[in-house]
């Protein structure tokens, strides 16, 4: 009986390790919403990292969040570093591409609670009636340790729910 239990445990562990090993080595999380405002009104809220305080879901998770800005106020080269509690972590982001009223691409470097180097992207598409479809995506490599963690935690749900909240906040800020 004891040997059977040990065998089942070993098989389960090997199954988890094997599943993580064959999982994709890149990830992409994406959410979309429509905002009743033109791209020219939505774009500055994304392209100016100082404006993120008004809508980023992570800003509200740590009232004592430490922020620092560097580079230009907005657009390519604008950077934002943060240091916060366990929910927010520590990291840096820098705008690497900025196409007025159309696209913002950001290099994301997380140091804590885990190290990761990803890309975030905002695409703005004008819609009929003066509204804007905004797509917020994050993508990057998924090393083995992250894939192993994803066996137990659905990162798309965890991060995607924050993107949903952020897009709702962005919508509220842009529609004022």
Question: Can you annotate each of these PLM segments?
Answer:
Residues 28-30, 88-93, 116-121:
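Short, surface-exposed coil-to-beta transition loops
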Residues 23-25, 72, 85-87, 112-116, ...:
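A generic structural micro-feature
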Residues 39, 43-52, 77, 92, ...:
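Extracytoplasmic/secreted envelope proteins and their assembly/folding machinery
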Residues 78-85, 105-111:
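Short beta-strand segments that buttress and anchor functional surface loops
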Residues 96-97, 107-164, 170-172:
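Beta-strand/loop substructures that line and gate deep hydrophobic ligand-binding cavities in soluble
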């Amino acid at each position: 009986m004891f040997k059977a239990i040990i065998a089942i445990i070993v098989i389960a562990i090997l199954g988890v390790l094997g599943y993580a090993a064959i999982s994709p080595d890149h990830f992409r999380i994406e959410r979309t919403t429509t905002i009743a405002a033109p791209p020219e009104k939505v774009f500055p809220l994304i392209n100016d990292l100082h404006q993120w305080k008004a809508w980023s879901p992570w800003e509200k998770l740590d009232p004592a969040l430490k922020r620092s800005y560097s580079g230009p106020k907005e657009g390519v080269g604008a950077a934002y570093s943060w240091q916060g509690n366990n929910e927010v972590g520590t990291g840096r982001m820098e705008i690497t591409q900025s196409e007025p009223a159309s696209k913002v691409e950001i290099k994301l470097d997380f140091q804590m609670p885990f190290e990761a180097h990803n890309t975030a992207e905002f695409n703005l598409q004008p819609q009929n009636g003066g509204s804007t479809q905004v797509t917020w995506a994050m993508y990057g490599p998924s090393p083995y340790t992250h894939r192993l963690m994803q066996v137990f935690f659905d990162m798309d749900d965890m991060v995607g729910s924050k993107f949903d909240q952020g897009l709702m906040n962005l919508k509220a800020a842009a529609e004022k």
